[in-house]
Design a protein with these regions (language model features):
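Serine-hydrolase catalytic machinery in alpha/beta-hydrolase-like enzymes
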Residues: 6-98, 200-213
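Short, well-ordered alpha-helices that flank and scaffold nucleotide-derived cofactor binding pockets
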Residues: 49, 53, 114-118, 180
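Short aromatic-enriched loop/helix-cap "lid" or pocket-rim segments at secondary-structure transitions
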Residues: 72, 111, 149-151, 173-174, ...
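The feature captures the conserved acid-bearing segment of alpha/beta-hydrolase catalytic domains
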Residues: 124-187
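C-terminal catalytic histidine-bearing segment of alpha/beta-hydrolase fold enzymes
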Residues: 187-233
């Protein structure tokens, strides 16, 4: 399916930030993509283009890089505010709303869907509203934000969860724990990729990062195909 691709600025509380829009012709759904710590959806563009080719308009905000591996309440809430601006402007009641995120981006999607996230210092983060996502595709999400009792009790949506066995940022044991928690609320499609690390799900790796995948091209093509099938099913 044809789609157009543009990058433009929008405003949140009189502050401008950038979004990339991949607008599908006669879109079946709207996908909100949330990048990880680095904040750039450009590193995931081949994946997002495949999703758009399957008939979904993709909205991908750009964020400033988080300076620390342990982000603060203020830093995460700033991202959530930008995401809520995007959701208000681009989600429509007549279109299916889907979230797709990597790492801390996947964590923020769970918070937007009703998860009660706590930072490492014990401060709560979260949106002004709970957003009704029909599906969430979560790639190597940061899990520690949701390990307190009842944290994900109000998340009620179909989940696609994928993690790498060689991930040292989000270890497989944490991903399996998240799967067990989410299964209490609904259906979870879980894939544990044997050779994948935390950054294997990025089409463009961060500087000085080497991937554990022996054949990145084949892996990324399969990843994009699987996610596109999930969001359009």
């Amino acid at each position: 399916m044809d789609f157009s691709e543009i990058t433009q600025s929008i405003q949140n509380n009189k502050k401008e930030f950038t979004i990339t829009i991949l607008e599908a012709t006669q879109a079946l759904c709207v996908v909100i993509f949330v990048a990880g710590r680095g904040g750039s959806p450009v590193r995931h563009l081949p994946l997002l283009r495949v999703v758009a080719q399957h008939g979904c308009t993709v909205i991908a905000p750009h964020f400033e890089m988080l300076p620390s591996l342990t982000p603060t309440k203020e830093e995460l809430n700033a991202r959530i505010e930008q995401l809520e601006t995007v959701l208000r402007d681009y989600s429509h009641s007549h279109q299916t709303l889907i979230g797709l995120g990597h790492s801390i981006g996947a964590t923020l999607l769970l918070a937007l869907a009703g998860g009660k996230a706590l930072t490492f210092s014990g401060h709560g983060i979260g949106p002004h509203s709970i957003w009704k996502f029909e599906r969430l595709a979560l790639l190597a999400p940061s899990v520690d934000f949701f390990l307190h009792p009842g944290a994900l009790q109000t998340v009620n949506t179909q989940i696609y969860l994928r993690n790498g066995r060689k991930d040292t940022v989000t270890p497989p044991s944490k991903a399996l724990l998240l799967k067990q928690i989410l299964e209490k609320q609904g259906h979870v499609d879980f894939l544990l990729d044997e050779e994948a690390g935390h950054f294997s799900y990025m089409d463009e790796l961060p500087p000085q990062i080497e991937d554990s995948q022996s054949n990145r091209e084949v892996f990324l093509v399969d990843l994009a195909r699987n996610i596109a099938q999930f969001v359009t099913t």
